[in-house]
Amino acid sequence: MNQPLHYQSATEIASQIIRRKRSAWDVLEHFLARVEKYNPALNALIWMDTAGARQTADDADAALDKGQVWGPLHGVPMTIKESYEVAGSPTTWGSPEFRNNVTDTDAVSVQRLKKAGVNLFGKANVPLMLADWQTYNEIYGTTNNPWDLSRTPGGSSGGSAAALAAGLTGLDAG
């Protein structure tokens, strides 16, 4: 049985991109359309770099035109928990004290994911200091469960869980 693109594994998505069954651009646009449609009710993703992700998708497709594969996750659209340092993005851990903290470096894990070929396009909501059973903080508000908006998707990685469950991303590190 063929699953919709947004519920396929990251390795399945990468394989389709690498084998030129889908372009990195089209895959990214699929996920961005889902974010636009579903994220307003979920508040799972709280920061996005759409322009940067589109450029990376173009670069991923151009690399394949030259026979270059970036890694096993070539072109896969990915989001990541807000607490990870991603250059140019807020990293607050949901704490108002760090509201204006924008990091200028990538965490080692982010560097390694990018080396594997991912297209990191957004960050997912977290509870205050990553330490609650639900996902709420004063900066970004509440993340809702995609299957029942009156419920929580859980705590520390709730934004990541909601984004994956709703098919807003091909991969997430929470």
Segments the model singles out, each with a brief description of its role:
Residues 22-23, 69, 169:
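Conserved hydrophobic residue
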Residues 50-73, 99-103, 113, 133-153:
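Flexible, acidic active-site loops/lids enriched in D/E/S/T/G that coordinate Mg2+ and/or position polar
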Residues 61-84, 118, 123-125:
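Glycine-rich, aromatic-flanked loop segments that form ligand/cofactor-binding clefts
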Residues 105-174:
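Short glycine/serine-rich loop segments
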Residues 1-55:
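An N-terminal boundary/leader segment
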Residues 72-109:
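Enzymes and membrane/adaptor proteins characterized by extended Gly/Ser/Thr/Asp/Glu-rich
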Residues 13-17, 60, 160:
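Generic hydrophobic alpha-helical segments
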